[in-house]
């Protein structure tokens, strides 16, 4: 059975690209036509490429490897968090902090600090500290949780990145390229496909489209993890 159907893609509006004046000519081969000043993505190609990315994600997960979900634009935040949690992976959905990959050592120190503050909140340390100090520490903890909560369980570099909107997440992509980490991404008509290892041509602005494609990739991970368990 196909991992995604043409009907699902159409219903979620995956075929709607950007306005024709905002396009990247490198995406020409994935465009079916132009309608009312908007590019329409060729969903036959999308179906095939979703299948390819699904198999890549499944393969990575079956090896017990880690995939980091990244989508910080408003339309992607909820789907990125929900689907990463559903398939037991990590995510960044607020802001990509420069060096999250290339300077992971420093990021790790901030994650350790978050764990320390959480422990202090749990073990009663906050109750014996001056009120002013507790307010300050809670504020620090909330800020760290906001930006690092999705990766606080990540002890080492991810083996791959799944990205919504490579234009928005260009720093994440640059860092992944520097470290040779493969990138799987939804790529709209205004993006550069050359930066991506495994792409899904599709609408990265509609909440339903982002949710459908992100959920499909999460399904691939869940399936891959089951393969890993049966092999064990």
From Swiss-Prot:
Coiled coil: none annotated. One of its GO terms (cellular component) is cytosolic small ribosomal subunit. PROSITE patterns: RIBOSOMAL_S2_1, RIBOSOMAL_S2_2. Keywords: Ribonucleoprotein, Ribosomal protein. InterPro entries: Ribosomal_uS2, Ribosomal_uS2_bac/mit/plastid, Ribosomal_uS2_CS, Ribosomal_uS2_flav_dom_sf. GO terms for biological process: translation. SUPFAM superfamilies: Ribosomal protein S2. GO terms for molecular function: structural constituent of ribosome. Gene3D superfamilies: Glucose-6-phosphate isomerase like protein, domain 1, Helix hairpin bin. It comes from the Bacteria. The keyword Ribosomal protein applies. Belongs to the universal ribosomal protein uS2 family. PANTHER family: 30S RIBOSOMAL PROTEIN S2 PROKARYOTIC AND ORGANELLAR (PTHR12534), SMALL RIBOSOMAL SUBUNIT PROTEIN US2M (PTHR12534:SF0). This is Small ribosomal subunit protein uS2. It comes from Alkaliphilus metalliredigens (strain QYMF). The lineage of its organism: Bacteria, Bacillati, Bacillota, Clostridia, Peptostreptococcales. The gene is rpsB.
């Amino acid at each position: 059975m196909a991992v995604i159907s043409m009907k699902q893609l159409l219903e979620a509006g995956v075929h709607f690209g950007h306005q024709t004046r905002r396009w990247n000519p490198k995406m020409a081969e994935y465009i079916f036509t132009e309608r009312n000043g908007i590019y329409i993505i060729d969903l036959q190609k999308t179906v095939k490429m979703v299948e390819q990315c699904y198999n890549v994600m499944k393969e990575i997960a079956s090896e017990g490897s880690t995939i980091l979900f990244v989508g910080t634009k408003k339309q992607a935040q909820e789907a990125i968090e929900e689907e990463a949690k559903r398939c037991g992976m990590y995510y960044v959905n607020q802001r990509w902090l420069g060096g999250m990959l290339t300077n992971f050592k420093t990021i790790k120190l901030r994650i350790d600090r978050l764990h320390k503050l959480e422990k202090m909140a749990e073990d009663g340390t906050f109750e014996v500290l001056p009120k002013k100090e507790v307010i300050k520490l809670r504020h620090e903890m909330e800020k760290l949780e906001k930006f690092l909560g999705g990766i606080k369980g990540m002890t080492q570099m991810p083996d791959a990145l799944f990205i919504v909107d490579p234009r928005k997440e260009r720093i994440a992509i640059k860092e992944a390229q520097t470290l040779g980490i493969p990138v799987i991404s939804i790529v709209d008509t205004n993006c550069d496909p050359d930066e991506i290892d495994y792409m899904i041509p599709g609408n990265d602005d509609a909440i339903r489209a982002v949710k459908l494609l992100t959920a499909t990739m999460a399904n691939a991970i869940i399936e891959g993890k089951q393969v890993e368990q049966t092999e064990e």
